[in-house]
Amino acid sequence: MALNMNAYVDEFMEALEPFMKVTSSSSTSNSSNPKPLTPNFIPNNDQVLPVSNQTGPIGLNQLTPTQILQIQTELHLRQNQSRRRAGSHLLTAKPTSMKKIDVATKPVKLYRGVRQRQWGKWVAEIRLPKNRTRLWLGTFETAQEAALAYDQAAHKIRGDNARLNFPDIVRQGHYKQILSPSINAKIESICNSSDLPLPQIEKQNKTEEVLSGFSKPEKEPEFGEIYGCGYSGSSPESDITLLDFSSDCVKEDESFLMGLHKYPSLEIDWDAIEKLF
């Protein structure tokens, strides 16, 4: 409330400032020839000095009604303007600051075996070739460190066949050891457990079956196993295997011998042909 009163007083004094100056000559002449003032006395416009000739301060009781009306009108206009400004300030919405979008920001590069936590850290993991389980390699501050940790583990497990994020750096060996000693020991034990992982062996057998068109038998059956009888061993001088016709299986199965005499031999007798000529 006190602040509003001070504001109105300041505006009132600013409005009275043009009328608070009178000329020195007029003030001295008025002081030398004072005029009696009565309650019914109203000065005329001819008796009022012009504003431009006033240079000294005078009392408010010496203002004309026209000047007082002008002062009231000016005060009223200033009050209306101040109220409008206050109302417009309350009605207008405050500008909200938009977030600055950096157009030049580069997108985050994705690395193999690396993922980001919700709080900003980077985690490196690798899948083991034997049982396809994940091995946690550690948490790092940057994505590059996590990618380098994955490369070190992958190069130890898979060798030169590993797909790396930084192949030139890892294969040349110009890098610092990022993996912890416990992770290194675990990777060494995994590498020493088996030379060739089990899934790779199964994959190799399946590849051979696809190329040949049929599955490879575990063991080729022998002649004696097919006909249910044994056979004599081969002589050391030749690789021809001789059948043992004296065995019980041949005697019992007479159809075996009858089949030999049923069909003629298809071999050419060259001696008989030479006798004809």
Curated annotation (Swiss-Prot):
One Gene Ontology cellular component: nucleus
GO biological process: ethylene-activated signaling pathway
One Gene Ontology molecular-function label: DNA-binding transcription factor activity
Subcellular location field: Nucleus
Keyword Hydrolase: no
DNA-binding region: 110-167
Source organism, top-level taxon: Eukaryota
Tagged with keyword Nucleus: yes
Alphabetically ordered keywords of this record: Activator, DNA-binding, Ethylene signaling pathway, Nucleus, Transcription, Transcription regulation
Residues making up the signal peptide according to the UniProt record: none
Protein function: Probably acts as a transcriptional activator. Binds to the GCC-box pathogenesis-related promoter element. May be involved in the regulation of gene expression by stress factors and by components of stress signal transduction pathways.
Sequence similarity: Belongs to the AP2/ERF transcription factor family. ERF subfamily.
Name of the protein this chain belongs to: Ethylene-responsive transcription factor ERF057
Origin species: Arabidopsis thaliana
Lineage, top ranks: Eukaryota, Viridiplantae, Streptophyta, Embryophyta, Tracheophyta
